[in-house]
Amino acid sequence: MQLRLVEAAHILPVGAQYSTDDVRNGLALSPTYHRAFDNALIFLDENFVMRINPTKELQLTTLRLDGGLPDFKSYLGKKIHLPPDKRQWPESNMIRRANAYRRIAT
């Protein structure tokens, strides 16, 4: 049975210059974390660690929309699971471009 618990997410969004459908521009994320990633609430750093975007976190806190955020953040701050084949790892250049595209200071 396919439960669709994991989705393919582009690191550098499809509409951005230099984006590709290559596996090195992709991540496997749950639907919730995929939306958070696409909306720049979370980002991947060049050490392959998923992190919270402090600017977005502050916005949510200011608007009092931060309920559940501590639990959400508990899954962040660790290196993501990477494929055994390093040729399939996220490309550092895509990560840098994606963070610049989303205006995330790393």
Regions found by a protein language model. Name each.
Residues 3-106:
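A detector for short metal-coordination/catalytic motifs
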